[in-house]
Amino acid sequence: MPHQKEAIAKLLPTRVGALFMDMGTGKTRTAIELVKLRQKKISKVLWFCPVSLKETIRQEILKHTTCSAEDIYTFGDKTASNAIPNATWYIIGLESISQSDRVALAAHSLFDSDTFVVVDESSYIKGHRAKRTERLTQYARGCKYRLIMTGTPITQGIQDLYAQMKFLSPKILGYNSFYSFAANHLEYHKKRRGLIVRAHNEAYIAARIRPYVYQVTKEECLTLPSKLYDVRYFYMTEQQREAYEEAKLEFLSKLEYDSEWSAIDIFQLFTSLQSIVCGFWNRNGQMCSIPHRRLERLLEVVRDIPEEEKIVVWAKYQFSIREIAKALRAKYGARAVAEFHGENERSRDNELARFKHDAKTKFLVATQSCGGYGLTLTEARYAIFYADSFKYGDRLQAEDRCHRIGQTNPVTYISLYCLHSIDERIEKALDKKGDALAAFREEVEKVKQTNKTKIRELVMAL
């Protein structure tokens, strides 16, 4: 496509570059073409991507190159340095670089000056102190060619760019450490350590990265069918309301001992409240189910969708995945439901293939954390969000699994929200393309500066 040719023309003269292309605009194909054009100058390709995408990337390489299956080696959990076959393409899970020393060491043994390194979904290395970021940046330092790619390079602020650009080259931004970068571009809260309140000199950063970045939005380069939205509401049961209020009171009791809340505290509060409106509560390590109406509402929505349509159901919690899958199988049969979640890659890949190719597999039940990045699910034009992420970026990523190149029909997204609950705050934040956690934390900070006693009212209003 024209925009892919533009990307190649811009980045081919440089040894390092970034494809900041919207989801569904063909980043993977563009990256593969860049590799092919440099194949005489490199000995191998190390392609790092989310674990859930490894099989997708393998299929794309087979589709768009002359490589055979033997030319591609996909790292697994048990891959070790002394058992890596010779290959041209190596596909490695990003999560494994931080979670498995064995895999990290095995990957490290493959880096040399003639290696082309691709980091697919480079938002995974935006944390400058994260183990995977530090390892990959160090490993790739001597590699001649480096490419990063993501549709969401910035989710929190310009600080997200630092580590991604440093991976390519510290010379791009001109700072040898995050602290020198922060001193010139970030303003921190005077009392809340680490809380960024303002960014400065953004034009300087934009100018520094411009020669190395190709950026395009879906609206600029594609004519895709429209997105359609629908919302279905429901109320809590009495048991849910009782647990919901109890969870808020337990959280507030902490104020008696510690008036300072961290982002983790607020995350735990939001997670507890959201889990309750999803029908369970992990209270002090004890899991208990609670009667609820969310699953009933889901089944009502499914009944309204034409029988021949495939449907993606996005859930957030493993409890919900099990409950949804059980209910759908009971009504539509065991073969009708595929699940995409958990750590078993082979199982995930098999389930995904079944959803894509088996006409009798109507549902794909997946978590946004596992399936929300990189997958192509254009077989479905209906997606139901059983429970939403707190972040707009996660929601957008999940939406664009169905709404991308290859989709020829309008895609309908149906959200399930519980009235008079945390769901309403999440819905409001997502409508504003924001972060529900960050928005609540800002409210807490404002209240604390005026009247700390109002914090209780703020929490009880959730």
Where are the model-predicted features located?
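Conserved Helicase C-terminal RecA-like lobe
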Residues: 13-16, 25-26, 30-43, 223-245, ...
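Conserved P-loop NTPase motor "coupling/switch" region that bridges the ATPase
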Residues: 43-44, 63, 85-86, 116, ...
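Conserved Walker A/P-loop ATP-binding site and its immediately adjacent core
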Residues: 30, 42-63, 155-160, 316-318
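Conserved pre-motif I regulatory segment
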Residues: 1-20
